């Protein structure tokens, strides 16, 4: 009887436990429905329920409330440029849709940077929500993806302006750059983030985008769009965010893969692991937990115990409840970027792949960097920095050079992002360098303008430049010549012109073409190593192309004697060399100017003086008579071997190449006094005494210095030398006339012979092809003849009447 009573009691207990389990299922099911996640996972405890309530809700409104909300919302049309831009993004990036998440997280990070910066001077800025995070949640059941940040948020006006008009988005420039990239066949995905239009990439995967935002200075609003138009309305739920923005994407059918946790996690790690704020993903994991055993299981286990001594000891101790280990699936926010800021870690602990991944993350580039340097500067100011040289030059690198801010150096103070809008963080010529600078010595609670004038920034700038030049210097020669110089060579030349304190360092980075090799470029160090034994100058020749420079009459004797000549073929090259007075103790010599001299023996000197005396009549005649108003003086040349003559500038005058450049600039800006002055400077006319034309001219001048033919020949030689020396002729028509006159004389044609007049053309008779047309013409002629006869008869009668 007693056994039956015990058995009945056990049944009651089992039934009660079953009811409790069913109740727990119902409670957990409600929580799951609220979160929009799968019902297949194990149930969660009360602590997790509280965390789930912090998860992002879709609307908190039923279907009828949502419909009413949309009916009352204010409708807006996108600007035409924004509409065009969205279509361009969707059409050009459809194969790289995943970048939408990178852009949304990047925008969230920017919003967090802004509120953190505001909080430095406004202690109430974080009152609505002190947490600075990005949270991502997938809702498979409702086909929704949420991205929430606790950043600065947007007011109603900002929602309209930032997400619907061109004023804030940089759309116009983006469209131009996008078109250029497509024409060049280059990747366009990195352009999205660079021009602040990354938000619109959400439409790559979403049919509809809903933005809920709360700014400290406004109530919470909802922005909604299907890419055709957008609407904005006050959120009837009130302030559910505290502060920040939630972007909800209603995903397209083919984009359902972005609701998979593994996909989202991989994308966050791929693109955003170096974001400076924690990124959480609402995800599940399996945990092993201890649960109390039921009484029947516990009793069974006790019976299986065979150790009597253990049993005795257990009886003596206070009996503990029996437990068992079970696996349970729980949901929680999982941190995806728990990596310490890479620049705060010792460089020895950072792998090469980590640097590359960080570069791509913060620069929004798709290629690996060409070079990088990670260092800690100590002394007057302490800071940590990582600097990168990109593989290719940014688009528009020299557009409005010096007037546009550089966005490539990000300044942090005590890990707090301050700005990327400093004009003087790096010199203009290093505007391609990207990186971060983090200092503990700069003040936090001051304005950007005040910080920009801080004396420590000048110290930081100086060290950044030195480290950048060290980084560039370490690039391997082959990679430097083939890649770096092609992309950034002009920047180095501008640095020589602008940066006096680092001119010597920059000079070692210069590369030019030279006569040493038909295609390879050379450094100045290599040139100096190859100089002839008694050569004391570095020779260079400037021209619009290598072909023009190496065919110039100025390099004839130099090349024949085995001297190497550097060819300057870019407009900035001659400015660069002028700013560099010497290199390694060797001065530069422009071979198109006065001052080119060669070592000569005593006998050579005597021969030269004898030749000068022999040609003195011709030289004086040219200077005082034939070319009186055109040249400063005429001399026997030491640099010509094949050409009859050349026009040489003074040491302070302009070469032909420089004059051409300056005149082109003058036409754009309007001529100034200095341009006119240098352009009007007379030059030295050098003649080649061994050339047959010059020798014959000497003979003719000795015979008759008033011979007009010889005078014309002298002027033609001067004008030809002007062109061959790289200068422009002021009167090309007169030059053409003189050439024609010389040709007439060479062909024994009378200089005054006129051009034959063209004969007058007689009107052509038209012949009709068809018989019908001919007959019609005959009829018309007969009618016309009859009319003429009648007219003559009438005129005759009138005349007779007049006589009577």
Curated annotation (Swiss-Prot):
The record marks 448 as: Important for ATP hydrolysis. Coiled coil: none annotated. The modification N6-acetyllysine is found at residue 479. Keywords: Acetylation, ATP-binding, Calcium, Chaperone, Disulfide bond, Endoplasmic reticulum, Glycoprotein, Hydrolase, Hydroxylation, Nucleotide-binding, Phosphoprotein, Sarcoplasmic reticulum, Signal. It is found in: Endoplasmic reticulum lumen; Sarcoplasmic reticulum lumen; Melanosome. SMART domains: HATPase_c. The modification N6-(2-hydroxyisobutyryl)lysine is found at residue 168. A motif (Prevents secretion from ER) lies at residues 801-804. Gene3D superfamilies: 3.30.230.80, 3.40.50.11260, Heat shock protein 90, C-terminal domain, Histidine kinase-like ATPase, C-terminal domain. One of its GO terms (cellular component) is sarcoplasmic reticulum lumen. SUPFAM superfamilies: ATPase domain of HSP90 chaperone/DNA topoisomerase II/histidine kinase, HSP90 C-terminal domain, Ribosomal protein S5 domain 2-like. Pfam families: HATPase_c_3, HSP90. Its EC number is 3.6.4.-. Belongs to the heat shock protein 90 family. ATP-dependent chaperone involved in the processing of proteins in the endoplasmic reticulum, regulating their transport. Together with MESD, acts as a modulator of the Wnt pathway by promoting the folding of LRP6, a coreceptor of the canonical Wnt pathway. When associated with CNPY3, required for proper folding of Toll-like receptors. Promotes folding and trafficking of TLR4 to the cell surface. This is Endoplasmin. It comes from Sus scrofa (Pig). The lineage of its organism: Eukaryota, Metazoa, Chordata, Craniata, Vertebrata.
């Amino acid at each position: 009887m007693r056994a039956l009573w015990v058995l009945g009691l056990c049944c009651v207990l089992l039934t009660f436990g079953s009811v409790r389990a069913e109740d727990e299922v119902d409670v957990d099911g409600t929580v799951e429905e609220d979160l929009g996640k799968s019902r297949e996972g194990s149930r969660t405890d009360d602590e997790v329920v509280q965390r789930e309530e912090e998860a992002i809700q879709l609307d908190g409104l039923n279907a009828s409330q949502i419909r009413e909300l949309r009916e009352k919302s204010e409708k807006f049309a996108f600007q035409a440029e924004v509409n065009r831009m969205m279509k361009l993004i969707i059409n050009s990036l459809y194969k790289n849709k995943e970048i939408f998440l990178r852009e949304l997280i990047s925008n969230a990070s920017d919003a967090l940077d802004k509120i953190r910066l505001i909080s430095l001077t406004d202690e109430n800025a974080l009152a609505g929500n002190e947490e600075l995070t990005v949270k991502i949640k997938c809702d498979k059941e409702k086909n929704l993806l949420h991205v929430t940040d606790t950043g600065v948020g947007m007011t109603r006006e900002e929602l309209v302006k930032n997400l619907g008009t061109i004023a804030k988005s940089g759309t116009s420039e983006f469209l131009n750059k996008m078109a250029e990239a497509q024409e060049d066949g280059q990747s366009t995905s990195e352009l999205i983030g660079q021009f602040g239009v990354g938000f619109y990439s959400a439409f790559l995967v979403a049919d509809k985008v809903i933005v809920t935002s709360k700014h400290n200075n406004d109530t919470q609003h909802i922005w909604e769009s299907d890419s055709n138009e957008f609407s904005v309305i006050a959120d009837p739920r009130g302030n559910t965010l505290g502060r920040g923005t939630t972007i909800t994407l209603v995903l397209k059918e083919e984009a359902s893969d972005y609701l998979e946790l593994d996909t989202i996690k991989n994308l966050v790690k791929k693109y955003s692991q170096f974001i400076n704020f924690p990124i959480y993903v609402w995800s599940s994991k399996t945990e092993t937990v201890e649960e109390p055993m039921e009484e029947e299981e516990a009793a069974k286990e006790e019976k299986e115990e065979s150790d009597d001594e253990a049993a005795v000891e257990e009886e003596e101790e206070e009996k503990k409840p029996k437990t068992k280990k079970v696996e349970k699936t729980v949901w929680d926010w999982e941190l995806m970027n728990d990596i310490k800021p890479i620049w705060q870690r010792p460089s020895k602990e950072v792998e090469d792949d980590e640097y590359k991944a960080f570069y791509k993350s913060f620069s929004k580039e798709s290629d690996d960097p060409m070079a990088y340097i990670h260092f800690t500067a100590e002394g007057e100011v302490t800071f940590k920095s990582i600097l990168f040289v990109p593989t290719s030059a940014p688009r528009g690198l020299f557009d409005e050079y010096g007037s546009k801010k550089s966005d490539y150096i990000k300044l942090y103070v005590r890990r707090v992002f301050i700005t990327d809008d400093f004009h003087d963080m790096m010199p203009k010529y290093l505007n391609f360098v990207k990186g971060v600078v983090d200092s503990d010595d700069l003040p936090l609670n001051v304005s950007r303008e005040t910080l920009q004038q801080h004396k420590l920034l000048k110290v930081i700038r100086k060290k950044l430049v030195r480290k950048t030049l060290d980084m560039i210097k370490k690039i391997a020669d082959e990679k430097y010549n083939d890649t770096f110089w092609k992309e950034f060579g002009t920047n180095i030349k501008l640095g020589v012109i602008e940066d006096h304190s680092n001119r010597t360092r920059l000079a070692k980075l210069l590369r030019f073409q030279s006569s040493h090799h038909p295609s390879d470029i050379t450094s100045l160090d290599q040139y100096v190593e190859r100089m002839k034994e008694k050569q004391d100058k570095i020779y260079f020749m400037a021209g619009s192309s290598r072909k023009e420079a190496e065919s110039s009459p100025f390099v004839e004797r130099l090349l024949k004697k085995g001297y190497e000549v550097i060819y300057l073929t870019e407009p900035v090259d001659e400015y660069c060399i002028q700013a560099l007075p010497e290199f390694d103790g060797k001065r530069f010599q422009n071979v198109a100017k006065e001052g080119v001299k060669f070592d000569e023996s005593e006998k050579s000197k005597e021969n030269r003086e004898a030749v000068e005396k022999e040609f003195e009549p011709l030289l004086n005649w040219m200077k005082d008579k034939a070319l009186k108003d055109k040249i400063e003086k005429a001399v026997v040349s030491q640099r010509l071997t094949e050409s009859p003559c050349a026009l040489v500038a003074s040491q302070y005058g302009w070469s032909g190449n420089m004059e051409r450049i300056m005149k082109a600039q003058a036409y754009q800006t309007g001529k100034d006094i200095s341009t006119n002055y240098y352009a009007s400077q007379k030059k030295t006319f050098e003649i080649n005494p061994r050339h047959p034309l010059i020798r014959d001219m000497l003979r003719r001048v000795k015979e008759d210095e008033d011979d007009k033919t010889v005078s014309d020949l002298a002027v033609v030689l001067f004008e030809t030398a002007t062109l061959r020396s790289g200068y422009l002729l002021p009167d090309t028509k007169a030059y053409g006339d003189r050439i024609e006159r010389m040709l007439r004389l060479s062909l024994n044609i009378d200089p005054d012979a006129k051009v034959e007049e063209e004969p007058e053309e007689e009107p052509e008779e038209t012949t009709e092809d068809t018989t019908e047309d001919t007959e019609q013409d005959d009829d018309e002629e007969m009618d016309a003849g009859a009319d003429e006869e009648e007219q003559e008869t009438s005129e005759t009668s009138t005349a007779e009447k007049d006589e009577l």
